[in-house]
Design a protein with these regions (language model features):
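Paired small-residue
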Residues: 86, 97-105
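Juxtamembrane intracellular "pre-TM" segments in multi-pass secondary transporters
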Residues: 1-13, 194
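Structural signature of the two symmetry-related core transmembrane helices
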Residues: 74-88, 169
């Protein structure tokens, strides 16, 4: 995996998918806890989860064509921007509508980051490296998801709902900066031959 991670395209792809996946899990594990803490009922939590699921999977019909048209980096940055907007909406209020809109935007952002990052991964490796590259990405996503899942409850209990949303901002910013750096970088010799 060291040789794969030496390639900027692979690093950007793995960071994008792992960050999107981990942050989505962090926020969505904390969301029902925050809603309960604000006195919202189980039905409201169920509706928020429904809208989040729509946000996660409904864009599947357009995410691929968006990547084809605008490219992996721009779509990844668009997904990251939606995570930022999601956090801002969550920070603006604690009503049912704030939770629902924020969670839906979080789902759409996750979808765009996942599709863009996965496609970007495919541009960074040779066909004979496919299984190793996919394994690297899956291990990264799963590891980050596990950490964020455990961290979510502790973070909301110790620091609150606002901290969960503020905490995702530096990670999303890092994804955007890495993707922007890729725009100006000439293709690496190892990637040029792929």
């Amino acid at each position: 995996w060291r040789a794969l991670l030496a390639r900027p395209t692979i690093r950007a792809a793995v960071l994008t998918t792992a960050a999107g996946h981990g942050l989505m899990i962090l926020v969505m594990n904390a969301t029902p806890l925050a809603m309960h803490g604000e006195g919202l009922n189980l039905q409201a939590s169920g509706q928020v989860i429904q809208w989040h699921m729509l946000g996660m999977f409904l864009p599947a019909f357009v995410a691929g064509p968006l990547v084809d048209r605008w490219g992996c980096r721009l779509v990844a940055c668009g997904g990251a921007a939606l995570l930022i907007v999601s956090a801002i909406v969550a920070l603006l209020g604690i009503t049912h509508w704030h939770f629902m809109i924020s969670s839906c935007l979080l789902g759409v952002g996750w979808n765009l980051m996942l599709v863009a990052g996965t496609t970007q991964l495919g541009h960074g490796h040779a066909p004979n490296e496919r299984a190793r590259a996919q394994g690297l990405m899956e291990l990264s996503n799963g590891s980050v998801a596990a950490v964020m899942s455990f961290a979510s409850g502790a973070l909301i209990a110790q620091a609150g709902w606002a901290a969960v949303n503020i905490g995702l901002l530096p990670i999303v910013t890092l994804v955007v900066l890495v993707q922007i750096a890729q725009w100006d970088r000439r293709r690496q010799p190892a990637e040029r031959s792929l």
